[in-house]
Amino acid sequence: QDSRHRFYLCVTQVLRSGGTMRKRMAAILAAAMLAMGTFAGCGSVADADTVEIVNVSYDPTRELYQAYNTLFEKHWEEQTGQKVRIIQSHGGSGKQALEVANGLDADVVTLALEGDIKTISDSGLIDPGFTSEFPDDSAPYTSTIVFLVRKGNPKQIKDWDDLLRSDVSVITPNPKTSGGARWNYLAAWYYFEGQGESEENITEHMKTLYQNVLVLDSGARGSTTTFIENGQGDVLIAWENEAFLSMQEEPGEYEIVVPSASVLCQPTVAVVDEVVDRRCSRAVAEEYLNYLYSDEAQKLAGENYYRPADQDIAK
């Protein structure tokens, strides 16, 4: 068992390293891990024809992970000869984090912000230091916050100040359940702070903004549905990727307004240590997140309107 543990640590180090070495060695090491069973008691998983993992993610990543899972399934089978079945769960990031912390078995989490994963880590399920487990602070792609308005921008919404007007109705998710909503809040606060406003004034501005919100959905995709399908609101505060996806699906019906100030959003990923060790799924779970940094996956992120962490591909 000690030799297997040492071997596992070696494997993990190589899989987490970047560049072509990781790509060359991943197949050999992953196959060897499966052959050895990695830990005592994990032999049945290693010998199984199919392994299953659960990815608990936030609302607007549905299309990204639907495509990525197909890519990863092919990659894993080519590397190891074993099939992998990936179960997806999507919802407001804060709500998803609480579900995992309260017992929803997730092998990996791909959530909207570091704080939501810290909620799970604080429950003892994820080891501390998760932001250093993968490159770029464990954020394989980023985004920002923009406004989506209806064709012609009838209310002439140009910046955060306009969202305080009494004639403007706003759609944004609930910060209590949605990670995207918290990024929205931070972006607005950052703008008013940059205008030299006092904390007291900014707090009042935020109250006014939220008084203009018609519906506080639990997640970003719900807010998009409220704005697009239900036709409510003059402006949707949205992830950049979600806004571009909406324009792709409804060409000519909407416009993106880029406010003068916003924030760089860093969705974070992590392996749920307690779950993968219990389910003997660490090898496939770690490679699932590692492969998000591959050229193929980074290009896929860009195609889904995320900003790839790999700056060469982002160009």
State where each predicted segment sits:
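Short, low-complexity disordered leader/linker segments with a strong preference
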Residues: 2-52
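A conserved helix-loop-strand patch within extracytoplasmic ligand-binding domains
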Residues: 121-193
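Alpha-to-beta junction loops
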Residues: 103-110, 167-168, 230-238
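Extracellular/periplasmic juxtamembrane helices and adjacent flexible linkers that interface
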Residues: 276-315
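Residues embedded in well-ordered beta-strands
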Residues: 146-148, 255, 268-270
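Extracytoplasmic
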Residues: 48, 81-83, 95, 103-105, ...
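Ligand-binding pocket segment of bilobal, Venus flytrap-like solute-binding proteins
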Residues: 195-260
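Early extracytoplasmic/lumenal segment of secretory-pathway proteins
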Residues: 43-123, 133-134
